[in-house]
From Swiss-Prot:
<dbReference type="InterPro" id="IPR001680">
    <property type="entry name" value="WD40_rpt"/>
</dbReference>
<keyword id="KW-0853">WD repeat</keyword>
<feature type="compositionally biased region" description="Acidic residues">
    <location>
        <begin position="106"/>
        <end position="117"/>
    </location>
</feature>
<dbReference type="GO" id="GO:0070545">
    <property type="term" value="C:PeBoW complex"/>
</dbReference>
<dbReference type="InterPro" id="IPR019775">
    <property type="entry name" value="WD40_repeat_CS"/>
</dbReference>
<comment type="similarity">
    <text>Belongs to the WD repeat BOP1/ERB1 family.</text>
</comment>
<dbReference type="GO" id="GO:0030687">
    <property type="term" value="C:preribosome, large subunit precursor"/>
</dbReference>
<comment type="subunit">
    <text>Component of the NOP7 complex, composed of ERB1, NOP7 and YTM1. The complex is held together by ERB1, which interacts with NOP7 via its N-terminal domain and with YTM1 via a high-affinity interaction between the seven-bladed beta-propeller domains of the 2 proteins. The NOP7 complex associates with the 66S pre-ribosome.</text>
</comment>
<dbReference type="Pfam" id="PF08145">
    <property type="entry name" value="BOP1NT"/>
</dbReference>
<dbReference type="InterPro" id="IPR036322">
    <property type="entry name" value="WD40_repeat_dom_sf"/>
</dbReference>
<feature type="compositionally biased region" description="Acidic residues">
    <location>
        <begin position="39"/>
        <end position="51"/>
    </location>
</feature>
<feature type="repeat" description="WD 3">
    <location>
        <begin position="612"/>
        <end position="652"/>
    </location>
</feature>
<feature type="compositionally biased region" description="Basic residues">
    <location>
        <begin position="1"/>
        <end position="11"/>
    </location>
</feature>
<feature type="repeat" description="WD 4">
    <location>
        <begin position="653"/>
        <end position="692"/>
    </location>
</feature>
<comment type="function">
    <text>Component of the NOP7 complex, which is required for maturation of the 25S and 5.8S ribosomal RNAs and formation of the 60S ribosome.</text>
</comment>
<dbReference type="InterPro" id="IPR028598">
    <property type="entry name" value="BOP1/Erb1"/>
</dbReference>
<dbReference type="GO" id="GO:0043021">
    <property type="term" value="F:ribonucleoprotein complex binding"/>
</dbReference>
Length: 782
């Protein structure tokens, strides 16, 4: 270490150790650093009491204490350090004499006579903890009493390199002007202790201002984390505040000046008229030419340069796949879209509340009066960035497009011309009914057609001529909702329903004597049974009320051919006969337990097969060859075995409201018409779900019917005023499904009060069908 000339003039020996120690203790900078004396207990970890001798020798016991006091190695280290403090200290002072003492020995005689106080040094010389020269400067009395720095600075040397203090025992000065001593370093042992027990806030760095380990607080660590994440350091700070419209934010109502407009703004300008006349006069005189012909240049003067003249076409790389193009924008992306593309408040709120992944569109259509009023697109940068990501991150695959005819993918259906005969034209119109015609039925012989309507009449017409041959009024208040011929040919019986009454009619004026007598015998056979009388209970309780009351309607009706009257508990809407003609079922949708009733003609007996029916009954149908009974509610169709009296199957058409059903003559297929405009085909052997769903009508379907004469035809009637004729081929092979082909749409009925075709029925042998409309007419289609 080099010593300047002023330091060579020191005339004394090394300064007393006691004074140096007192100054260090007075500064209070070594609190917690120095070790305890040997007389104190080893378990005491308090750093407040320090030993002066340890200060002189520069050794520290606390630096070598370990948290595990019971270990043998830690105990040996402590003993060795104490031996160094006691015995080794004197030897170290003898062997390692400070350099300033050797330099100053020869100068004692020269400086003894000098008594000038100005030449006395302002420091004392001693040794530090490592045996090196240590200069202890006197305290500096600060002149000022305040500090103008923002942060509290431990070291106040300023912005200078700390290498200037490498030759000094201190590293700077604190706020009071006192020296900040260089802390002692226990290099190996401190590193071991730090690796064992890492203090809170430890960074492993050294503070260049103080020389001590640099520890960071939780707040400082949080600031560093935010900086590394490119986040705002201060909580609650908004780097992008909303712009406050100071000048245009407030809309003024009153004008700045309310002075009336001057007259000169409403009359032509005379000065402008003079200027225009000068220009017109110059044009007329030829001095001004409105159109100046371009000068003709020779071909040699026109020189054109082809920049790509020497350019050679470069073929694309074999693995090059061009980027897919973006789809063109639609009407909703226009700055002035049509009104139907603009969302309302509810749609806008739903769009804002939905997640970005769930939104159908990435933007909300907005309307602007002019293109200059369109602001900047907010998500333009984001869209370009995502497009760039898609271009270089998404893999591209070259797919060979297959040129396939779409019609080849459709099932091969037969040509409708090959499926004839089926009805195509209207052959006859039956007029004479007042109000709506609600029901229609063709007799088993195919000669007569029966109909009923809102006027309460049952009318019978000739099928070929359309002439009305018989009628009878059943009710003055109720409409005739259902008519159905008995399906056998030996007797001609017509069942009609009006309100809560069901009438069995024999139109004897239209029948031969033999058919008339057989028809009367069928109806009179049940009078011998006392089925209409209430039954008496065995225990003497009150007799049970019969669900149906069979009686004669009266002489007036009997003269017209109405022979039997059945009274039930609720209005009847549907009548369907069993194939043998001895039973028929009625459906009353308003009834609960009496909604479905089965009537026996030969016994004049009415039975209620269901004590409790799930849902509201809509219609019922007998199986054409088995003892199975189908009951349709609004949403389901249940099939019951009447012989075993058990439920066979539940069909789930998936419709909201079933209107009508019909069973195929083979018995394995059912068609269902619904009020939600669908026609459903059910295969009973396939599934309880529909095999086919046909949507060809714009309004509700009222009735569906299969042809019962062996032709593969079925039809439906809708409120849109049309009938759909279909070809339905069913084979006995279970491996082949039914073939359904739409054939013809028949239009002719007018729609009245949103009601079109109410009912239809097929001819028993021919491909003819009869339809009943809300316009008060019947139509024959062949």
């Amino acid at each position: 270490m080099s010593v300047n000339s002023r330091k060579r003039k020191v005339a004394t020996k090394a300064a007393p150790v006691q004074s140096s120690s007192d100054e260090e203790l007075a500064d209070g900078l070594l609190d917690g650093i120095l070790s305890h004396s040997e007389d104190e207990s080893e378990d005491d970890q308090d750093a407040e009491d320090t030993d002066a001798s340890s200060v002189i020798e520069g050794l520290s016991d606390e630096d070598f204490e370990d948290e595990e006091d019971s270990g043998d190695e830690a105990e040996e280290i402590r003993k060795q350090m104490r031996n160094l403090n006691t015995s080794g200290g004197s030897q170290q002072r003898k062997t390692r004499q400070p350099a300033h003492e050797r330099l100053d020995d020869g100068a004692d005689g020269e400086l003894e006579g000098e008594e000038d106080e100005s030449l006395k040094p302002n420091y004392t010389v001693t040794t530090d903890a490592h045996g090196q020269v240590r200069y202890l400067y006197k305290e500096i009395d600060p002149v000022y009493e305040s500090d103008d720095s923002d942060a509290e600075a431990t070291n106040t040397i300023g912005n200078i390199p700390l290498t200037y203090y490498d030759e000094y025992p201190h590293i700077g000065y604190d706020i009071n002007g006192k020296k900040i001593m260089r802390p002692a370093k226990g290099e190996a042992l401190d590193a071991l202790l730090d690796s064992i027990d890492i203090p809170k806030g430890w960074t492993g760095l050294t503070d260049p201002q103080t020389g001590k380990p640099l520890n960071l607080s939780e707040e400082e660590l949080d600031v560093l984390k935010r900086l590394t994440r490119n986040e705002v350091v201060e909580d609650g700070y908004d780097p992008y505040p909303e712009m406050v419209a100071y000048f245009s934010g407030k809309q003024e109502i009153m004008p700045l000046s309310a002075a009336p407009e001057p007259k000169r703004r409403f009359i032509p300008s005379k000065h402008e008229a003079k200027r225009v006349m000068k220009i017109v006069k110059a044009i007329r005189e030829g001095r001004i030419k409105p159109y100046k012909a371009p000068e003709e240049r020779e071909e040699d003067e026109q020189i054109s340069y082809d920049v790509w003249a020497d350019e050679k076409p470069r073929p694309e790389h074999s693995m090059h796949i061009p980027a897919p193009k973006l789809p063109p924008p639609g009407y909703e992306a226009s700055y002035h879209p049509p009104p139907e593309y603009l969302p309302d408040k509810a749609e806008e709120e739903a769009w804002l509340q939905a997640d970005e992944e769930d939104r159908e569109k990435d933007f909300l259509p907005k309307n602007y009066e002019a293109l200059r009023k369109v602001p900047g697109y907010e998500t333009f940068v984001k869209e370009r960035f995502e497009r760039s990501l898609d271009l270089y991150l998404a893999p591209r695959v070259r797919r060979n497009r297959l040129n396939i005819d779409p019609e080849s993918l459709l099932p091969k259906l037969p040509d409708p011309e090959d499926l004839k005969p089926f009805p195509t034209t209207c052959a006859a119109i039956f007029r004479g009914q007042e109000g709506r015609v609600r029901c229609v039925s063709v007799d088993p012989q195919g000669i007569f057609v029966a109909s009923g309507g809102d006027d309460g009449y049952v009318r019978i017409w000739e099928l070929l001529t359309g002439r009305q041959v018989w009628n009878a009024k059943l009710s003055d208040e109720e409409a005739v909702d259902a008519v159905q011929w008995r399906p056998t040919k030996d007797a001609s019986v017509l069942a009609a329903a009006s309100g809560e009454h069901v009438y069995l009619i024999v139109p004897f004026t239209l029948l031969s004597p033999d058919v008339e007598q057989s028809s009367r015998d069928v109806l009179d056979a049940g009078w011998g049974y006392a089925t209409s009388k209430p039954s008496t209970a065995a225990n003497g309780e009150a007799p049970k009320q019969s669900p149906g009351k069979w009686s004669r309607p009266g002489s007036r009706m009997e003269n017209k051919g109405i022979l039997v009257q059945i009274e039930v508990r609720s209005a009847v809407k549907i009548i369907n006969w069993h194939r043998r003609g001895d039973y028929f079922a009625t459906v009353s949708p308003r009834g609960q337990s009496t909604a479905v009733a089965i009537h026996t003609v030969s016994k004049h007996l009415t039975q209620l097969p269901f004590r409790r029916l799930k849902g509201i009954a809509q219609t019922a149908q007998f199986h054409p060859s088995k003892a199975i009974f189908f009951v349709a509610t609004r949403n389901t169709i249940r099939s019951y075995d009447l012989a075993k009296q058990e439920l066979v199957k539940i069909l789930q058409p998936g419709a909201k409201w079933i209107s009508s059903i019909d069973v195929h003559p083979g018995g394995d297929n059912i068609i269902v018409g619904t009020y939600d405009k669908r026609l459903l085909w059910h295969d009973l052997d396939l599934s309880n779900k529909p095999y086919k769903t046909l949507r060809f009508h714009k309004e509700a379907i009222r009735a569906v019917k299969f042809h019962q004469g062996g032709l593969p035809l079925f039809a439906d009637a809708s409120d849109d005023g049309s009938l759909q004729i279909f070809h339905g081929k069913v084979v006995d092979d279970l491996m082949e499904n039914a073939t359904i082909v739409p054939l013809k749409v028949l239009r002719g009925h007018k729609v009245k009060s949103r009601l079109g075709v109410m009912d239809l029925d097929w001819h028993p042998r021919e491909p003819w069908c009869v339809s009943a409309g809300a316009d008060g007419t019947l139509r024959l289609w062949n």
